[in-house]
Amino acid sequence: MRVDGREKTELRHIHIHTNYLKHPEGSVLIEVGDTKVICSATIEERVPPFMRGEGKGWVTAEYAMIPRATEQRTIRESSKGKVTGRTMEIQRLIGRALRAVVDLEALGERTVWIDCDVIQADGGTRTASITGAYVAMVLAFEKLLQAEKVSKIPVKDYLAATSVGIVEEQGVVLDLNYAEDSKADVDMNVIMTGKGQFVEVQGTGEEATFSRAQLNELLDAAEQGIFQLIDIQKEALGDIVSHIE
């Protein structure tokens, strides 16, 4: 039994609150256990200079954490005047993952700005951001469809992400909280589509190694969790699902 009472391959309690903010075209508050992230999607009727004239859209992301999202207050990056390497890595990961399932030609010459703001962190903030951002983005696309600016919702598949790891005395576990993540021998983030295709796998041994058999076990656990997350996304999207499938 894990520190929070879960089974080894059991997700934390997940809830996705849709249309959480008033102004963005799409927004959610995603809760993954005690991790809470506000994800918003903004549609801009232009593309970056390097995309002009190509007849395709673009998806990009920004990620931030409020000072007391963590146990000890952290200084805002805006106060430092620069974005940390960790933040830059996560922003690129979110944007890259979402672009994998967006039909950029069907989107047209528009930019989707994804903003992920962590208001409470207890492990898995980047994977929660991806799972929530997908829903926020689809909500924004639904508004484009209603306004007859696109002929269909420009996504090719569902997308969700979770963490898996190897924790001493537990073995392979799914959806690590901070306490588990901080002592994990192996930590891995997995992003997959609804068809079971991998978008990205980030795995690291923390002063430890892992075998091919353990890798397979980690990926199996992640796949199981991601399919559950996609079911939760579908429930949150409601009738919009009929425009995707």
From Swiss-Prot:
Family: Belongs to the RNase PH family.
Role according to the record: Phosphorolytic 3'-5' exoribonuclease that plays an important role in tRNA 3'-end maturation. Removes nucleotide residues following the 3'-CCA terminus of tRNAs; can also add nucleotides to the ends of RNA molecules by using nucleoside diphosphates as substrates, but this may not be physiologically important. Probably plays a role in initiation of 16S rRNA degradation (leading to ribosome degradation) during starvation.
Catalytically driven reaction(s): tRNA(n+1) + phosphate = tRNA(n) + a ribonucleoside 5'-diphosphate
Miscellaneous comment in the UniProt entry for this protein: Sulfate ions in the crystal structure may represent the inorganic phosphate substrate.
Assembly information from the UniProt record: Homohexameric ring arranged as a trimer of dimers.
Keyword Membrane recorded: no
Keywords: Nucleotidyltransferase, RNA-binding, rRNA processing, Transferase, tRNA processing, tRNA-binding
Key word rRNA processing present: yes
Top class in the EC scheme: transferase
Entry GO MF terms: 3'-5'-RNA exonuclease activity; tRNA binding; tRNA nucleotidyltransferase activity
Lineage per the UniProt record: Bacteria, Bacillati, Bacillota, Bacilli, Bacillales
PROSITE patterns: RIBONUCLEASE_PH
Protein EC: 2.7.7.56
Transmembrane segments: none
GO BP terms, alphabetized: rRNA catabolic process; rRNA processing; tRNA processing
Protein name per the record: Ribonuclease PH
Residue numbers binding phosphate: 86, 124-126
Lineage: superkingdom: Bacteria
